[in-house]
């Protein structure tokens, strides 16, 4: 289980404690409310918290019980969308409240700490998705992710043009024939893959039975969780494609080298990765008719019109992805 007090450097922990607000909350205190956008990211310093979501019938469903070092509220911060669950203390607890405005400024103020923070958030979400994959199949629903357009753009909305160019230099085109398998659960993941075209099915073996837990579409990464684990545990799921895919196969060693040498790039890359995984986690819940109050809050929101800044960001992200696709699909180096 993820524990920030173990995972984070002493320097980052000191910065968080100096800039956050410590509060002691009694048993039964609601820290985050499903359906509302959280103004803080929270770190549990001591105690215990429960994470409960709402199903389509309005009943509470427990997602997790978390202990010291847990981080909550990061999904709402990353996506600027309503929280998918209530977070309630299960015992008297000490909680560190981190303002989202403060965290947004960290990139400019402390780029190396920002890169470490974003990587920790990505690792936390990776652990969350791995846990979620183990039980999400128990809930009925269409089982298809919501709003694929968001996923196409999320990586390229955070990265800049030079970042995308740098990633392109690390990659080559790979085609997966219809019905073939890209990754097998538990086996080594030699590269990171960006879907340029097609769709991937994600399967997890649970007690000897393969269960489909999601899909990934163009603009998403595959194999990215291996960047976030301290030990080589192999692929967390099997990835196949019914109709075939075109992928940008990214050299993992080159990518890790660039991430370690360039804090600003690492900050943007891990934030984009976290946004993608946050959406993946949210979509799994929504596809199984969970996070009902969050879904309702977004449906009731009349402020769906995008401002010029958002439209500009979407346009730039789309252009970056289109340029990358053109570069490789029109004659780049190909691997079958």
Question: What do these predicted ranges mean?
Answer:
Residues 1-336:
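Cytosolic regulatory regions built on CNB/CRP/Popeye-like sensor folds
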